[in-house]
Amino acid sequence: MLGFKKTYSLPFKFEIPNYTQEFLAKRSLFKSLFKYIKRCLYIFLKGQRSLETLKILDEHHKILWINFSAPSIGDSLMDLSSRVLLSDKKIDLLTDKKNKHLYKDDNIFSSVYSKIDDVVENYYDLAIVDSYSTRSINIKHQVMPLAPFLGIYGHYNGPEVNRVLYSFHRLNSLL
């Protein structure tokens, strides 16, 4: 299937510590392919396929970062560590309620939300979703159905990586 390699290939040119080979040796190809097809189909059925962008542009001033796929405190801190690269933008965060307090007084995030209803009234130029999981895409669709979006992990799913390095390299590649 076209694009399936995105599920286990780093989306930038730099090597970072990862367990891709171990993952590929142990994974079920059928399950991985099924998950990829399911996510692609979900994005298409939600009308989001044509809204995916591959760059954060100058006109993307107000951005909503949706961070729900890995709700553990450590994963959230590592995945969002690259936010400093967006200090010239107005960034709001929608995250799990148990992580909201971590970012309440953050100097990058203008507002921090844990409820979808609190975000719906705002206008954003772009959504950054943590991954293309059905949960993240559904939240993006509920909050801003017609706005462009991109993914930090996107379709990348499975291999363990150094999350801090991944976050910085990925966000840098989107700028």
Per-range role (PLM):
Residues 1-175:
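Catalytic machinery of carbohydrate-active enzymes
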